[in-house]
């Protein structure tokens, strides 16, 4: 069975200060087989140490927080078997799952704040 992970969108936030940040998700549409591993890329632009988030939106549902990074350990464990690794040198926070299920078919959003 093939899973389709619906188009990924970059989310842009502006803090209360004049400094802006942005997120880019280069993978527009990904199809994987059930049981295969998954990596969704997220690159950010931010001057200081960012707060990073991954959200999922399943069909007909609201956004659900998968995981977040504030500081400390760069490998973050989330819900539903997802994890993400913060790599400051690459300005990335890629979402991974070792074995996807059909129920993982959804839209995934990376955010910085």
Curated annotation (Swiss-Prot):
Residues 21-113 form the Ig-like domain. GO terms for cellular component: T cell receptor complex. It comes from the Eukaryota. Residues 1-20 form the signal peptide. Gene3D superfamilies: Immunoglobulins. Alpha-beta TR is a heterodimer composed of an alpha and beta chain; disulfide-linked. The alpha-beta TR is associated with the transmembrane signaling CD3 coreceptor proteins to form the TR-CD3 (TcR or TCR). The assembly of alpha-beta TR heterodimers with CD3 occurs in the endoplasmic reticulum where a single alpha-beta TR heterodimer associates with one CD3D-CD3E heterodimer, one CD3G-CD3E heterodimer and one CD247 homodimer forming a stable octameric structure. CD3D-CD3E and CD3G-CD3E heterodimers preferentially associate with TR alpha and TR beta chains, respectively. V region of the variable domain of T cell receptor (TR) alpha chain that participates in the antigen recognition. Alpha-beta T cell receptors are antigen specific receptors which are essential to the immune response and are present on the cell surface of T lymphocytes. Recognize peptide-major histocompatibility (MH) (pMH) complexes that are displayed by antigen presenting cells (APC), a prerequisite for efficient T cell adaptive immunity against pathogens. This is T cell receptor alpha variable 8-3. It comes from Homo sapiens (Human). The gene is TRAV8-3.
